[in-house]
Amino acid sequence: MTEESTKENLGAPKSPTPVTMEKNPKREVVVTTGPLVSEVQLMAATGGAELSCYRCIIPFAVVVFITGIVVTAVAYSFNSHGSIISIFGLVLLSSGLFLLASSALCWKVRQRNKKVKRRESQTALVVNQRCLFA
């Protein structure tokens, strides 16, 4: 199998490789090329995990949320309203809530898409079954 047919099978991009130019201390221009990665190659490398970001966000969001609770509690236990630590705690708290909410939203959208795909495939099966028995 040739290299070109392998690239076509993996979905390699058709455009030329990107080129970056840098100047080194001797005032010479160094040209560095880097490969482009297509979505197919990314899915092959990650095993399709790029579509499950909501599962990765949840643990990080929980840690940030708990840290925000602790920092805010410590700040307000010393009556330091408006200090840097209380603002930092509130920022962590709100960031954790935002990450949890976005993760829940992504999960709901993903579930809805799965339901639509199931319904479409079931409709196709019923139509095929009717054609067979008609």
Swiss-Prot record:
Residues 1-23 are annotated as: Disordered. Pfam families: TMEM100. The chain crosses the membrane at residues 56-76, 84-104. It is found in: Cell membrane; Membrane; Perikaryon; Cytoplasm, Perinuclear region. It comes from the Eukaryota. Its main location: membrane. InterPro entries: TMEM100. Disruption phenotype: Mice die at a mid- or late-gestational period. Show embryonic lethality due to impaired differentiation of arterial endothelium and defects of vascular morphogenesis. Conditional knockout in endothelial cells show similar vascular defects to those observed in global null mice. Conditional knockout mice lacking Tmem100 in dorsal root ganglia (DRG) primary sensory neurons, exhibit normal mechanical sensitivity but reduced acute nocifensive behaviors induced by mustard oil, consistent with a reduction in inflammatory mechanical hyperalgesia and TRPA1- but not TRPV1-mediated pain. GO terms for biological process: angiogenesis; arterial endothelial cell differentiation; BMP signaling pathway; cellular response to BMP stimulus; endocardial cushion development; epithelial to mesenchymal transition involved in endocardial cushion formation; in utero embryonic development; Notch signaling pathway. Signal peptide: none annotated. The modification Phosphoserine is found at residues 15, 121. Keywords: Cell membrane, Cytoplasm, Developmental protein, Differentiation, Endoplasmic reticulum, Membrane, Phosphoprotein, Transmembrane, Transmembrane helix. Coiled coil: none annotated. One of its GO terms (cellular component) is endoplasmic reticulum. Expressed in dorsal root ganglia. Expressed in neurons as well as nerve fiber bundles connecting ganglia and fibers innervating muscle layer of the gastric body, jejunum, and proximal colon. Expressed in arterial endothelial cells and neurons of the central nervous system and peripheral nervous system (at protein level). Expressed strongly in lung, weakly in brain, heart and muscle. Expressed in enteric neurons and vascular tissue in the muscularis propria of the gastrointestinal tract. It is a multi-pass membrane protein. Plays a role during embryonic arterial endothelium differentiation and vascular morphogenesis through the ACVRL1 receptor-dependent signaling pathway upon stimulation by bone morphogenetic proteins, such as GDF2/BMP9 and BMP10. Involved in the regulation of nociception, acting as a modulator of the interaction between TRPA1 and TRPV1, two molecular sensors and mediators of pain signals in dorsal root ganglia (DRG) neurons. Interacts (via C-terminus) with TRPA1 and TRPV1. Interacts with TASOR. This is Transmembrane protein 100.
